[in-house]
Amino acid sequence: MLKKIIILFLGMFLLSACTDNFRSYFQRSANNRLVDSKGAKGGKRKPVYNNKYITLAKKNIVEDNLDDDNDDDDDYDSDSPLRGERIDPVKRNRDMYLKMIKRDIARQKAESGFAESDDDMTLNRANKKVRKDDSDKEKRMQEELNQIKAMLRETKRDISKYTCPNATVNQNYAPPVTNYEPVNYPPVKNSKPYNNNSKVKQKFIREDDDNGSNACSI
């Protein structure tokens, strides 16, 4: 039984070699695979394109970075009945890549869930965006203003702690009453006269003056 299957397979292989379409079975697909079930679409295989050059061509189309071909020999089709009509391959390729770019944009919008078209960018949407930006700015300004007010209140409290007590005079202030009797001490007898120009005395006088002037400083 196994021999019959082998003989049948070899016979089919030899008979199929006589046909012209047999060679296409071993051609590589667009995905560079020998056996590719996804390479064919509608009975036709896609041409082998290089994705790097397609991406570069799309980039040049978007940036309008095109090199026009000045050779006019290829612009005419000698076999066409419209021989005198000029064929512009640059424009044809540009239109082809523009269609590819539009399809890519539509696919990206569909994947991101953005169903609105470019025509829907109306004045209403622009006004909403501007109002949102203005409201955000006002909110930030209000927060900064509240922070400044809080800093001023805190500074005012700190200043009130270090205010000079003699700055304001209380009209109802009464000196404390003491019941101590005055004591008359006998004068101290000093054989030497007191020197008012002493350096030690002048030093203490200057220190007292400095302490008195800085009594109300913060």
Curated annotation (Swiss-Prot):
**UniProt name for this protein:** Uncharacterized lipoprotein RF_0637
Can you tell me which residues the record assigns to a coiled coil?
132-164
Top-level taxon of the source organism: Bacteria
Give the start-end ranges of region Disordered: 65-88
Q: Which controlled-vocabulary keywords does the entry list?
A: Cell membrane, Coiled coil, Lipoprotein, Membrane, Palmitate, Signal
Q: Determine if RNA-binding is one of this entry's keywords.
A: no
GO CC terms of this entry: plasma membrane
Which residues are listed under lipidation as S-diacylglycerol cysteine? 18
What membrane topology is annotated for this entry?
Lipid-anchor
Q: Where is the composition biased (Acidic residues)?
A: 65-78
Q: Where in the cell is it found?
A: Cell membrane
Q: Which organism is it from?
A: Rickettsia felis (strain ATCC VR-1525 / URRWXCal2) (Rickettsia azadi)
- Keyword Transmembrane appears in the UniProt entry: no
